[in-house]
């Protein structure tokens, strides 16, 4: 009887834990507390490992949905901005018509690529693996992104300083680079509601290209700078950026993934009430590369 009880009790506990999770699938943090050193204990360990994987996959799906909703806002807004431009003047201006259609097509392609990359990520695949050897004409990509923001935010001034740039291709996929620059400029716009001037500077260094995005906005406190690349940073009130803007803070986290994937570097300097500057260093291409 004693032996039977020692077997049935932990089995009953494990069954109860399973029942709770079955009745409340959102409660994925529950784990078996059985610590016996026998087959039942091994079963409990495997059950907990299984729940760890299920919880991890669930979190990845939630991150995917959050990433998609965040990252698609800007290209959708760009397309809408160009369509509004067409409605106002494009019918009688072939130049505006061609520019807007080209921009809308470009952003639609970029959305497709972003979604595919995010799907790769949620499938536990490297979303950058297929583009390790791709190269990018940074000057052309930056002009494309700035052109989109000029249409989207007509009340802002976007300045491009490229007198120290280089025509050498950089070791990064063009769509991922444009996504990174879009995140930086979008961030600058959001936090510059008064002084609406954004400076983008390109400088060619010895082995890499430096792209700087400077705003004259609200700035970030020194205590908070070390956290800005964390996913959901802005949702944590203890580390909330000094702004009235709301959101979940996905953009800079995705930017950092791009930085790491292509062995880039990024530095941040900021002063409250003065502004923020992001310095993005992208290595020049070396060896066999492809330009999409």
Summary of predicted features, one role per range:
Residues 126-131, 167-172:
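Conserved micro-motifs of the catalytic ATP-binding
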Residues 106-111:
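Short alpha-helical segment of the dimerization/phosphotransfer core of two-component systems
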């Amino acid at each position: 009887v004693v032996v039977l009880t020692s077997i049935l009790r932990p089995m009953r506990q494990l069954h109860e834990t399973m029942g709770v999770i079955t009745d409340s699938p959102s409660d994925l943090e529950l784990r078996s507390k059985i610590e016996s050193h026998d087959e039942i204990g091994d079963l409990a360990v495997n059950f907990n490992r299984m729940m760890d994987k299920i919880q991890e996959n669930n979190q990845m799906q939630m991150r995917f949905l959050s990433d998609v909703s965040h990252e698609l806002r800007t290209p959708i807004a760009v397309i809408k901005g160009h369509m509004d431009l067409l409605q106002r003047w494009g019918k009688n201006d072939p130049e505006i018509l061609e520019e807007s259609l080209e921009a809308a097509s470009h952003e639609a392609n970029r959305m497709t690529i972003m979604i595919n990359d995010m799907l790769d990520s949620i499938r536990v695949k490297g979303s950058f693996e297929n583009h390790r050897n791709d190269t990018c004409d940074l000057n052309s990509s930056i002009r494309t992104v700035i052109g989109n923001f000029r249409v989207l935010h007509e009340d802002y001034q976007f300045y491009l300083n490229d007198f120290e740039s280089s025509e050498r291709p950089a070791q990064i996929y063009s769509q991922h680079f444009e996504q990174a620059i879009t995140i930086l400029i979008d961030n600058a716009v959001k936090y510059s509601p008064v002084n609406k001037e954004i400076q983008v500077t390109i400088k060619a260094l010895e082995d890499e290209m430096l792209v700087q995005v400077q705003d004259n906005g609200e700035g970030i406190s020194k205590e908070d700078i070390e956290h800005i690349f964390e996913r959901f940073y802005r949702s944590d009130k203890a580390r909330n950026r000094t702004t009235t803007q709301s959101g979940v803070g996905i953009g800079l986290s995705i930017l950092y993934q791009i930085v790491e994937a292509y062995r880039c570097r990024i530095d941040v300097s900021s002063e409250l009430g003065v502004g923020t500057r992001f310095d993005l260093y992208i290595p020049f291409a070396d060896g066999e590369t492809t330009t999409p």
